[in-house]
């Protein structure tokens, strides 16, 4: 048996070092030149804890978004002085000292709108700005207007926005796409990264890194000028995700970076804090208390890191799918995250070349090639025949098939034969009458069966098309669009997630009621409508009968549901 060349790990380590050392200073500079706003649990200390534990509001996010009417230190001092007095009323104290978030206005669409007309009419309804942000507001100011998901949310979210922007582009709103890219670039320049959302309590983590793909989308309209303009911010974001890599030894992890024993560099999700999330304070405390065998701080970090993944929550992160307290997000190397990092490296190479820096472009290409090899080596389950996450504790690829397995196809990082196997696995295990299942496990969590989410439908559709698997790709689009149309026909809204075991039903689970709006569903629906309908005959609703495609000779109806575990 051939033994591995001893110099290979060192060589792999040296390749990125020159880039990471060049750009590490960029993220540090952003942190040093801005005063990072403190989240409400730090600003208000025991008052915040007491209000959340008292459950004064049905949604823990309400008080996390409340705006102090004066200096929080003064409010806290008043609270300490008054709290033990006879007749003290905590709710009254909160009402006097805080301005609570306003309920979002319920949008009643005009009657008789088609699906496309409904979505186009929603864009201005979902547009917000931070022009009137108060001094002590947890809402982080942004220079341009932005589109929120809808429903419960008053802030913009990172990875949601990419799929929303796909829809904005389809609707011809390139000005809004440009505004949102500018906002995210502003956050990178100000905070060193793009937070989960523009709230102070989201600053300790990011979300799936789609910024480079946003810039690439904008470049479809503005050309290479967009790539050159936002190259510095893309480099800063890359430095954030790779922060600490220059000092990593084989087998170690630091924040978001993982260095395996052979020197392979991959990434994981990570939150810099290990306390309950302000927006889910009581729930996180209860989850930690339910497992006394683990340190509470460890559970808090893994809960927060799962929120950073966008998949909050899923059996994907758990040892026991029925027990949230067994999640261990930080010891899992996700296949979707590393696919996005590969794509970021490829776009950085393209942008560097556009800027005339061929040497730097070659460096990023080298990093992308190394990561692609790492994905193929560590994130492919040969026994099962699909891509999966890598477990840092067992030092093995995990067995569970999830919709995240389609990300290597989405970014063109998959080997052709493996993409073909993924198509088979997708059709056999994940495709349902109402779209693509997130997993095949029923845990009660929202990122599990029977829920399907718009971004994952689009990633799968695009990924499979990239490898010539048009039939499965079109099956996913048709099934999901049918679900969206049936729900819209009944409820006159698009929702955050769908039950894909059938059609016409919104999804369940999660930490809050089902939301309507809905940014990323709007965007993906428009993209899929244009995919299934001929360009010469664009459709405003999902056709009653599936249009013929290259791979079909007659209209197809959705298949019957496959039993889930």
From Swiss-Prot:
EC number, UniProt record: 3.2.1.28
Renumbered residue ranges of the record's region Disordered: 539-565
Gene Ontology cellular component list: periplasmic space
InterPro entries xref list: 6-hairpin_glycosidase_sf (IPR008928), 6hp_glycosidase-like_sf (IPR012341), Glyco_hydro_37 (IPR001661), Glyco_hydro_37_CS (IPR018232), Trehalase_periplasmic (IPR023720)
Catalytic activity field: alpha,alpha-trehalose + H2O = alpha-D-glucose + beta-D-glucose
Keywords carried by this UniProt record: Glycosidase, Hydrolase, Periplasm, Signal
Protein's recorded name: Periplasmic trehalase
